[in-house]
Amino acid sequence: MEEERNSDEKENALCGRSLTAASRDGGGRMPAAPLAQGKVERGKVYSGDGVLGYLEMLEAQAHELGLKQEEKEQQEKKLDRLKARVQELRARRDELRAKVELQEKRLLDKEGVMTDPAQPSAQTVLEWKVKSLKAMLQVFYLTGISGKLTKQGVCFCISTAYEGTYLDSYYVDLLIKPLVKIQRHSVPVFIPLEQIAKKYLQTDIRRFLSVLSDHLNAYVGRRRQADQLEEHFSDHIDGTLQRNSLCNLLVFNYTVSSNSKTFPFNVRLLYGDLCCSLPTEAIISCTPGTLPLLAEMAAAHSNAFRHMALHKAFDSLINAKESQN
């Protein structure tokens, strides 16, 4: 019994040494699987501060950048769609203008060959005028001119503005049968409406409205500038600003200080172009016999008044004067 037990112990010892040897590689090293498993386990324990945490941060940043890139691409696509829509509207506008011009030409040609009084030429002309006016209303919608058809013609509304500020609206009620003529209007008497109508109303209504709109917008622009000057710079002006109804002639006085002396200047602004809100001539005079520097200053002021809005030009002159003082 004792011999059998000793034999079993020797056999088990030999098996243990064989397993130990088999578990080692050729250099006597233990396999890497348990060590690798230990690293993974340690990585799981310290993932918040280790490599996995860094990878999670990179993944979050990549996701955020992806969202921003997607948003940018969507904005670019939206901008491209808006640009395409603008081009489409412009093309539609040009198409309507071309149709109106073609209809006008056809009507003139048709009236030239009509000799039979039995033909319903008056009705044909009236129908054409109504169609032309409808197309014209669509063309003018984005230019500050709107209108609506009436039983006898069309009533136009011309809206005016200056520097993005809406000011006044004026109305022109036109009759289109048998000839185009003005029935009623709210245009100021000093606007040359009769001359404009005589020149364009019978041959080109679109041109008539465009020129009239230019006159009205230029007038309210000049008036707005004069109002701004009186409102914001009254303490720099001597006396009152003088102007006529059309505001195409403005006269006022202001003073300039130099070397403890005060020199008065007189300004006379003439607006030769009634379709423009800037003067064509700016005459500035100062006391005779004053310093040559004042003459140079007057020339600089004249140039500013001719190239800038009145209140903006005066503001720049006042600021320049205060800087010099």
UniProtKB/Swiss-Prot annotation:
Pfam families: CENP-O (PF09496)
Keyword tags: Centromere, Chromosome, Coiled coil, Nucleus
GO biological process: centromere complex assembly
Single GO cellular component term: nucleus
UniProt cross-references to InterPro entries, sorted A to Z: CENP-O (IPR018464)
Signal peptide segment: none
Deletion consequences: Increases time to progress through G2/M phase.
Subcellular location: Nucleus; Chromosome, Centromere
Protein name, as recorded: Centromere protein O
Family: Belongs to the CENP-O/MCM21 family.
Coiled-coil regions, chain positions: 55-112
Quaternary structure, from the entry: Component of the CENPA-HI complex, at least composed of CENPH, CENPI, CENPK, CENPL, CENPM, CENPO and CENPP. Component of a discrete complex composed of at least CENPO, CENPP, CENPQ, CENPR and CENPU.
Region ranges (Disordered): 1-35
Keyword Oxidoreductase among UniProt keywords: no
Biological function: Component of the CENPA-HI complex, a centromeric complex involved in assembly of kinetochore proteins, mitotic progression and chromosome segregation. Involved in kinetochore assembly and required for recovery from spindle damage.
Organism name: Gallus gallus (Chicken)
